[in-house]
A protein has these predicted regions:
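Active-site and donor-binding regions of nucleotide-sugar-utilizing enzymes
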Residues: 1-97, 216, 231-233
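Structural motif
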Residues: 6-8, 142, 223
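Donor-binding and catalytic core of enzymes assembling or modifying cell-surface/extracellular glycoconjugates
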Residues: 19, 158-252
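Active-site donor-nucleotide binding/catalytic segment of nucleotide-sugar enzymes
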Residues: 80-86, 113, 125-197, 248-249, ...
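Leloir-type glycosyltransferase catalytic cores
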Residues: 84-132, 258-332
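Hydrophobic/aromatic hotspots within intrinsically disordered, low-complexity regions
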Residues: 318, 322, 330-331, 347-352, ...
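Histidine-centered metal-binding segments
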Residues: 328-350, 368, 372
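Basic, mixed-charge low-complexity alpha-helical segments
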Residues: 364-379
Length: 387
């Protein structure tokens, strides 16, 4: 009989998958008897950080000594929830698929909501950011909108999601136009939306790559509007209300259809969605069949607007007075370029402009890759000079 070893789990994919894995790992820590298990965070450990049980088990993939100290004597497991039969047959959620694989279950079981633990600094930073935006936009209620999932790409002037999980640009612009007069609209996106000018009712587009700070903003916002992406999982973990629009994926798999605080608008079901076996086959036939399932007509757009208004209620002017946070002399944000003479901290969450659609400098991962490439070029130049 094979000797039982402690396990090391490699978790890949985006932050949404990480959040959905949390309930299964909580169960594993409670039930398995494995006190020394390891979670290797191939996609980053942002949402294991601060967790009262899981943080001590979680490591970034670049952690010094990871292999010798935490992997060599363990059985290696790479969970892939999309390949669980109950998942691709729409009998369980992403979190439950993780649970089946990580805990070796034969049947689907109910799980608690994911746990995201924000500390005092994170919580107040998010609150302050929301208050600043509300005061500048003169609105008393904030709506955070995440229009895109990870599969969206920019092709020239167009933003395209080949998997049809994100909002179509024209649709989300129309929705924003109907809501911006009532509420403080905050767009959670790495790619810039072509938001029309409106001096009286501006839209905030914070340039903030830190997802934990976005989580703190969602915690302080009055409502969340999104698609099949990380924001809805953050909203669930923080017990917030959400309107979620779904196209090519299926609500039972990727969202929370039994939660009264979630209004799921399933556009894909109305348009004959065909399940796409993500991470199983490379055939694009399903994506082609689903190519138009997120394209909304005016009636669909109005359903989204009405849903947000139902949760938010009547919008008013900002009440009270915003008190800015006193700036510190030391910057601890690893995403900032501290050697830049123009490096400032005046607006911690980026500018609030009429249409802040300037391109970002790149994600943290992209910037690090660029820095590594630059160092490599410098090293090669030094070798050339020596020769």
């Amino acid at each position: 009989m094979k000797k039982s070893r402690s396990k090391a789990f490699f978790i890949s994919g985006g932050a949404g998958r990480v959040i959905c894995s949390i309930p299964a790992f909580e169960k594993y820590a409670e039930e398995s008897g494995d006190k020394d298990f390891t979670i290797v965070c191939e996609g980053g450990m942002d949402f294991y950080r601060g967790h009262p049980i899981l943080q001590k088990h979680a490591y970034e993939v670049w952690h010094k000594g990871l292999f010798d100290q935490h992997l060599r004597n363990k059985d290696i497991v790479s969970p892939e929830p999309y390949r669980i039969n109950e998942y691709f047959n729409q009998k369980c959620s992403l979190a439950q698929a993780f649970d089946i694989e990580i805990n070796g279950l034969e049947e689907v079981r109910e799980l608690s909501a994911p746990t995201i633990t924000l500390n005092k600094t994170e919580t107040i930073t998010g609150y302050q950011a929301l208050q600043e935006i509300k005061s500048q936009l003169n609105k008393d209620k904030a709506l955070i909108i995440q229009p895109f999932g990870r599969t969206v790409t920019q092709m020239g002037e167009y933003l395209i999601d080949s998997s049809s999980r994100s909002f179509e640009v024209g649709n989300i612009i129309n929705i924003i136009e109907q809501l911006r007069e009532k509420y403080a609209i905050i767009v959670m996106a790495e790619l810039a939306l072509p938001i029309p000018d409106n001096e009286k009712h501006k839209v905030a587009v914070p340039r903030e790559p830190n997802l934990r700070l976005w989580a703190s903003m969602i915690k302080s916002a009055e409502h969340f509007l999104g698609c099949d992406s990380v924001g809805q999982h953050i909203a669930k973990a923080l017990d917030k209300t959400a309107t979620v629009v779904i196209g090519s994926t299926v609500p039972i798999n990727i969202s929370y259809p039994d939660d009264d605080k979630f209004d799921i608008i399933d556009i894909g079901a109305d348009k004959g969605r065909n399940y796409a076996p993500i991470r199983m086959t490379m055939d694009d036939e399903k994506d082609r069949q689903n190519d138009e399932v997120m394209m909304m007509n005016e009636e669909d757009e109005q359903r989204v607007v009405d849903s947000c208004i139902k949760f938010l209620g009547k919008g008013k002017e900002f009440q009270g007075q915003f008190t800015p946070t006193q700036q510190q002399n030391v910057c601890t944000n690893p995403d900032h370029n501290h050697s830049d003479p123009n490096h400032t901290h005046n607006v911690p969450f980026g500018s609030i402009a009429n249409t802040d659609t300037s391109p970002k400098e790149g994600t943290r991962k992209e910037r690090r890759a660029a820095e590594r490439a630059e160092r490599k070029d410098q090293k090669l130049n030094l070798l050339d000079n020596k020769e």
